[in-house]
């Protein structure tokens, strides 16, 4: 059986993964707050942990993995969106408007994540379906001295859990010293956080021992993870395998989840392994509406459908996410997504040219049994290495690279090379037969043109560099000539020399930023 190694945020080490129960491997990923369209950053954890889900199913069997990803459908942002509709004249009750908004947003979310090629989780609980379990957990925490009620609020007593801060590597005293926010007067300690808060007549609420109110954000995931992944376990085994999410959730959300859950069930471990994907950047900066680099998944899909006849840019977004390791930030600016789309189109083209017969289930099993893609993913989800392997196979099909370290004698059969490439692509979550429609010749041509026109002076800059190179060659300054050639090649410009001079074309992966300025 393939050994999976994962970086555990809790231990800060890469560890061999051994599930608690190989017949029921359990994964929990924090899902969205459903008040608006998913932005691009929301998509990265979905894609990253979709790959993990696929890997776990491959190793342990499809029927032996439980993947839970929740919907937070009770939140002040949701309330604000519903109140805005009511203020605009909608006569319906706030409860009806909230339900409509959350149902609508969940539908959008499914559409957008489907477009990114993500499998649906095994379970997708809504927080509002688990209010009773949250109240029961809060009552238990109060009874054990870990929580207290003040003015209709229930707060978690942070100092009652001695390991608070271990996940994020923070000290409670240092956090208090560095805090610059006003502390609510009903708190015993500035670090205590809300488990339950009161609701006025206008806001949604549920009856509880502390009055009508609604849950705090952190208790939701603790209750849902417990109820769906650990409910039938003995107290001393109250643990599940992997808890994952974006790095922005590490503190305070995941730290607070651990504190609540470990205090409610002190003999259990809650989650054995914690995984966090790093931030998404756009043009080297964190996404922000004020910087003008913020966009939703749906906005990108519609933009590329209208401008470039790409019916679904989602696979290109997915590939861009997979080109970087999940524990490193990645830039998903438009030109990188376009480069990924071009790459998908080339993958489809060269594989299709060499693949005549359909791939059988036995073919897939045999190929995956020895595939370097599985090896790469088993090594802490090394998706960049998996993509590089596919690139190597496609290069072989293109007649470019004749030998790679991982290519064996079997690779003399180009149809087998194509089969291996297609199986690898599909394992990473791409539907091969859809690539022609979304990233075929028409889209490839338009996107290559877009790459050229993305910067108005790209052609001029390349021309000037080639002129400098020609002058250097004429002066027999071959070091200078080679340096210019290397710069152009690094940027993704293919140069073809002839008696009449040099011509050029853009390769997949062209990056105008690497051209620099002519000297």
UniProtKB/Swiss-Prot annotation:
Native source species: Cereibacter sphaeroides (strain KD131 / KCTC 12085)
Compartments reported by the entry: Cytoplasm
Catalytic activity: tRNA(Cys) + L-cysteine + ATP = L-cysteinyl-tRNA(Cys) + AMP + diphosphate
Entry's EC annotation: 6.1.1.16
Residues that coordinate or bind ATP: 289
GO cellular component terms listed in the entry, alphabetical order: cytosol
Protein's gene: cysS
Cofactor note: Binds 1 zinc ion per subunit.
Residues reported to bind Zn(2+): 30, 221, 253, 257
UniProt short sequence motif 'HIGH' region, positions renumbered to this chain: 32-42
Quaternary context: Monomer.
This protein's name: Cysteine--tRNA ligase
Matches recorded under PANTHER family: CYSTEINE--TRNA LIGASE, CYTOPLASMIC (PTHR10890:SF3), CYSTEINYL-TRNA SYNTHETASE (PTHR10890)
Taxonomic placement: Bacteria, Pseudomonadati, Pseudomonadota, Alphaproteobacteria, Rhodobacterales
